[in-house]
Amino acid sequence: MPVEWLLIPFAYLLGSVSSAVIVSRTLGLPDPRQEGSKNPGATNVLRLGGKRAAILTLLGDASKGLIPLLIAKSMAVSPPLFAAIGFAAFVGHLYPVFFQFKGGKGVATALGVLLGFAWPVGLMALLTWIGVAALFRFSSLSALAAAVLAPVYVWLWLGSAELVVATLFMSMLLVYRHKGNIERLLKGEEARLGAKRL
């Protein structure tokens, strides 16, 4: 097996590391899997521990998607393998082997993957999130909007079928992981950014 193929399991294992759990334990915060929304992600950590903890979680989760792709770029892997490596990191965050396959929703890790595909694509997705969040104050709605538009951004900027397909699958999984949020949005019960979830 060519050594570059080992980047797929490496990306998955790195994705399986929970930044939210590590940051929360380090800072003496409640376990985000047990408190708040019970999602080990930056938004829940923001509610439980404030901005510093949330930023550290966001950077950690995004790095999980970015680092394997930076390594892959340095090895000049093929486009299909490059796409698979990014997708593996994302899946690792959603279904982590270290946490009984119960992970987060994948927003920050998906951002890291998109930045790894091409930084302008990641930037466009991030600006989409920021714009929707500024208008509506819902983290989940912002993530859903960015997820829907991400494959379009990849196609327009890169034109790579492999990367578009990988991004489509990431987007579908991300929307699926937000099904509870979608239900609450439709009922008018979703917590806004800055609100404490009881």
UniProtKB/Swiss-Prot annotation:
Claim: Cell membrane is one of the keywords in the record: yes
Subunit (UniProt): Probably interacts with PlsX.
Cellular compartments per GO CC: plasma membrane
Source species, domain of life: Bacteria
GO MF, any single term: acyl-phosphate glycerol-3-phosphate acyltransferase activity
Localization (cell): Cell inner membrane
Keyword annotations of the record: Cell inner membrane, Cell membrane, Lipid biosynthesis, Lipid metabolism, Membrane, Phospholipid biosynthesis, Phospholipid metabolism, Transferase, Transmembrane, Transmembrane helix
Pathway terms, separated by semicolons: Lipid metabolism; phospholipid metabolism
Enzyme Commission number, as recorded: 2.3.1.275
Class of this enzyme: transferase
Record's function text: Catalyzes the transfer of an acyl group from acyl-phosphate (acyl-PO(4)) to glycerol-3-phosphate (G3P) to form lysophosphatidic acid (LPA). This enzyme utilizes acyl-phosphate as fatty acyl donor, but not acyl-CoA or acyl-ACP.
Primary subcellular site in the record, as a coarse category: membrane
Catalytic activity: an acyl phosphate + sn-glycerol 3-phosphate = a 1-acyl-sn-glycero-3-phosphate + phosphate
GO biological process, one term: phospholipid biosynthetic process
Transmembrane segment boundaries: 3-23, 81-101, 113-133, 153-175
Membrane topology: Multi-pass membrane protein
Protein family (similarity comment): Belongs to the PlsY family.
Stated name of the protein: Glycerol-3-phosphate acyltransferase
